[in-house]
Amino acid sequence: MPKAAGDAKLLIQSLNKAYAATPTNLKIIDLYVVFAVATALVQVVYMGIVGSFPFNSFLSGVLSSIGTAVLGVCLRIQVNKDNKEFKDLPPERAFADFVLCNLVLHLVIMNFLG
């Protein structure tokens, strides 16, 4: 087996081992972020196949999905117990910030739709 393939296999095994120790609430947030990014990718593929006639609708959908994913990553950073920067921030406050920012994001997206 080539050295690069062995290194890649070792890297994947170490990532799987480290991710197995991740708390369940962080795994749920990760799943949410992956779903939001997958939704954006589906919208881009759909636009490539069918077309983007109401371009502002396409742009709103993609920006909403990507914005939601970014806010999900921010929530994950704030809720992570290993992150020393946000150790004094309670998870309830982080979730309230996430909900409020999502509300503002989607109000802006709805305004952009017209």
From Swiss-Prot:
Annotated membrane topology: Multi-pass membrane protein
Single GO cellular component term: oligosaccharyltransferase complex
Keyword set, alphabetical order: Apoptosis, Endoplasmic reticulum, Membrane, Transmembrane, Transmembrane helix
Transmembrane segments: 31-51, 55-75, 94-114
BP GO terms, sorted: protein N-linked glycosylation
Compartmental location: Endoplasmic reticulum membrane
Pfam families membership: DAD
Residues exposed to the Lumenal side: 52-54
Topological domains, Cytoplasmic: 1-30, 76-93
Pathway the protein takes part in: Protein modification; protein glycosylation
Cross-referenced InterPro entries: DAD/Ost2
Entry superkingdom: Eukaryota
Function: Subunit of the oligosaccharyl transferase (OST) complex that catalyzes the initial transfer of a defined glycan (Glc(3)Man(9)GlcNAc(2) in eukaryotes) from the lipid carrier dolichol-pyrophosphate to an asparagine residue within an Asn-X-Ser/Thr consensus motif in nascent polypeptide chains, the first step in protein N-glycosylation. N-glycosylation occurs cotranslationally and the complex associates with the Sec61 complex at the channel-forming translocon complex that mediates protein translocation across the endoplasmic reticulum (ER). All subunits are required for a maximal enzyme activity.
Assigned protein family: Belongs to the DAD/OST2 family.
Assembly and oligomerization: Component of the oligosaccharyltransferase (OST) complex.
Name of this protein: Dolichyl-diphosphooligosaccharide--protein glycosyltransferase subunit DAD2
Provenance organism: Hordeum vulgare
